[in-house]
């Protein structure tokens, strides 16, 4: 199997060692073999959501981690939770930053859905998180029972209010044509967060 298109160039020239390139190809082969994907390798790479090691950081935090995607045991473009919570340097860095800095609230951005999620299982900061979600205008506000994500960990383990804003209406990756509308919808969010923290 060969990498084609701009992904191959990026992997070869800027990002991936030959071992990492082989890991990406192995993830694709494993997902094809288990019928998790039927798309071409190029499309698989275009839709890639995980880190370079094939761990989906949306599932790598210690919030009901044990029950996440238990049948997916190999690195993948999406959905693989890793070998243990915070197994990835990116997740560790975010957790360390939040724990070491004393955040009062966190807004977590994701791409796809045009909604705000504010809830999770065993949410220690439900009222505060819902108030923060309601303060951000222009989105539908939904509860969720998410697991393994940053918001879920913040609310369950760290005791910090948090929301996830899902930007964009198209499938991931969000089309560049949506960026102006996303910017207009979100340019006041930092001030909204600051006001929320100052008044709560």
Task: Tell where the protein language model's regions lie, with residue ranges.
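Short C-terminal domain-edge/linker segments immediately following a structured domain
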Residues: 29-36, 136-141, 193-199
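Active-site/substrate-binding loop(s) of hydrolase catalytic cores
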Residues: 1-121, 126, 174
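Active-site-adjacent mobile loop/cap segments within catalytic or ligand-binding domains
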Residues: 94, 100, 105-108, 113-124, ...
């Amino acid at each position: 199997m060969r990498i084609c298109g701009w992904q191959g160039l990026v992997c070869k020239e800027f990002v991936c060692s030959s071992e990492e390139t082989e890991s990406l190809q192995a993830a694709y082969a494993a997902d094809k073999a288990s019928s998790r994907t039927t798309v071409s390798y190029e499309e698989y790479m275009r839709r890639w959501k995980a880190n370079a090691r094939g761990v989906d950081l949306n599932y790598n935090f210690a919030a009901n981690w044990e029950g996440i995607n238990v049948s997916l045991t190999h690195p993948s473009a999406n959905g693989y939770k890793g070998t243990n919570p915070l197994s990835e340097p990116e997740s560790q860095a975010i957790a360390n930053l939040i724990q070491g800095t004393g955040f009062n609230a966190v807004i977590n951005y994701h791409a796809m859905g045009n909604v705000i999620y504010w809830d999770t299982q065993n949410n220690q900061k439900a009222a505060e998180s819902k108030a923060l979600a309601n303060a951000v205008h222009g989105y539908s506000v939904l509860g969720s029972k998410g697991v393994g994500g940053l918001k879920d960990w913040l609310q369950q383990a760290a005791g910090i209010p948090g929301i996830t804003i899902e930007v964009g209406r198209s499938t991931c990756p969000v089309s560049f044509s949506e960026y102006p509308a996303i910017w207009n919808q979100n340019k006041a969010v930092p001030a909204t967060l600051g006001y929320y923290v100052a008044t709560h």
